[in-house]
Design a protein with these regions (language model features):
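Helix-helix packing/entry segments at the starts of transmembrane helices
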Residues: 41-42, 79, 83, 97-104, ...
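Hydrophobic/aromatic residues within transmembrane alpha-helices
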Residues: 29, 39, 43, 89, ...
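Hydrophobic transmembrane alpha-helices of multi-pass small-molecule transport proteins
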Residues: 51-52, 72, 112, 121-143, ...
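C-terminal-most transmembrane helix of multi-pass membrane proteins
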Residues: 1, 44, 141-142, 232-234, ...
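Transmembrane alpha-helical segments that form core, pore/gating elements
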Residues: 51, 109-110, 148-209, 213-217, ...
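Specific transmembrane alpha-helical segments of multi-pass solute transporters/efflux pumps
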Residues: 18, 22-23, 52-102, 138, ...
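Juxtamembrane helix-entry segments on the extracytoplasmic side of multipass membrane proteins
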Residues: 4-8, 33-37, 41, 63-69, ...
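Glycine-/small-residue-enriched transmembrane alpha-helix faces in small-molecule transporters
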Residues: 1-42, 149-175, 195-199, 313
Length: 313
């Protein structure tokens, strides 16, 4: 593994670590402190301000028009639309279902990459993807608890749409990611996302029969009437700074160095990370499935990387 590949793997591990931490945090935010639309708007706005500030401190980078279109459209699909689906999914179902469905992301990416950018599906690559899915599913299933969400069927459907749109983003922005800095890409991604996230959120509200379809919703978030806003503000700060700015900085950084399928395999780290953190803070116990799941996910990433570097891959 050369230095660029190592940097790509390290970046995507960091990104999926914070993404794994963000699932229970988002679940708490959209069920207690924000509406899904309010959550997405403030998340987009915060990330936009930070990325444009960072861009102002860096040398200006010119983006070709066709590449800018790919970045903007891909970003709107991969962030504004995908994460809105995710926020609504977590408002209707439990994080465990969401984590289970997220393990299907590498399959979606592999199939889309084969269909649209002619990335071959080799036997070794398929085996690697399946090993990673097995590792993540092992831990999710072993940690299954009773109880249901508000509407699990609807939540699961929205989670599937979230993973599909995220997979589309990984595939269509793969080549462009190698041409421009992550900050340049993300400043346009989040500016476009901030513009469309509320209209798309209103569309979701109207379709789901939830929330208020006007700007007054942003002025009436549950957080504003809480006796102490500190916890909700701290959680939102974590989502904006770590799960959005840091996480989405490292994704294009990684995609410039390793294939989209390899990037997607690391999605299976998210439930592993969530479980490790729960154990560390005393909310869970260490059982045999957790280290086994972690080893399987890392083995999966190694196999897919080896397969991608073969001449016929």
């Amino acid at each position: 593994m050369n230095q660029r590949n190592f940097q790509g793997h390290a970046a995507v591990i960091v990104a999926n670590t914070v993404f794994g931490l963000s699932v229970p945090v988002t679940n708490d935010l959209v069920n207690h402190h924000f509406t899904p639309n309010g959550y997405m708007f403030f998340r987009c706005l915060g990330a936009t301000l930070i990325f444009w500030l960072l861009a102002a401190l860096m040398p200006k980078e010119k983006v070709e028009r066709k590449d800018l279109l790919i970045i903007v459209v891909g970003g709107m699909v991969g962030f504004a639309i995908s994460q809105t689906f995710a926020a609504w999914a977590l408002a209707f179902t439990q994080p465990v279902y969401f984590s289970l469905l997220a393990t299907l992301t590498p399959i979606a990416v592999m199939l889309l990459a084969a269909a649209f950018i002619n990335e071959k599906i080799t036997g070794l690559k398929a085996v690697g993807v399946l090993i990673g899915i097995a590792g993540a599913m092992l831990m999710v299933v072993m940690g299954w608890t009773s109880g249901t969400g508000k509407n699990d069927l609807l939540g699961i459907s929205l989670a599937l749409l979230s993973l599909l749109t995220w997979a589309i983003y990984l595939v269509i922005t793969g080549k462009v990611s190698a041409k421009y800095s992550a900050v340049t890409q993300m400043k346009w991604v989040f500016l476009a996302s901030t513009i469309i996230v509320i209209p798309f959120g209103w569309l979701m509200s109207a379709m789901l029969g939830e929330g208020t379809v006007n700007y007054s919703e942003l002025l009436c978030q549950p957080l504003y009437t809480e006796p102490s806003m500190l916890w909700g503000v701290a959680e939102m700060a974590f989502i904006i700074i770590f799960a959005t700015v840091l996480g989405f900085f490292f994704i294009p950084y990684a995609m410039a160095r390793i294939p989209a399928t390899t990037v997607s395999v690391y999605t299976n780290l998210q439930p592993v990370v969530a479980s490790v953190v729960a154990f560390a803070i005393g909310q869970d116990v260490l059982t045999w499935d957790k280290p086994v799941a972690g080893v399987l996910v890392l083995l999966s990433a190694y196999i897919v990387t080896v397969a991608a570097n073969r001449p016929n891959a």
